[in-house]
């Protein structure tokens, strides 16, 4: 039992030493503006989807980390043949970090990735 106490105490102290703002994940909306995008990568349209005539919009929730990169993305509205390409693109997007009380915070926002056949 004592072997667990020390690592647990260290973990608790480490967690408590992180500023509250750094632990907060804020959803964009209301008074919280979406972060400004500084890099956008278009998705690579899968050949299989092109041949099948599949097009549409994949909707995702993207978590933007305190450094401005996408740290998590979850598909909300799926188009199975296009989901992987949408996720691959979104994970390359970059944003200016969002500040809360002067400290960078993670934000969650809904993003769309359009696939249009030409």
Tell what function each PLM region has.
Residues 2-118:
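Charge-biased low-complexity segments
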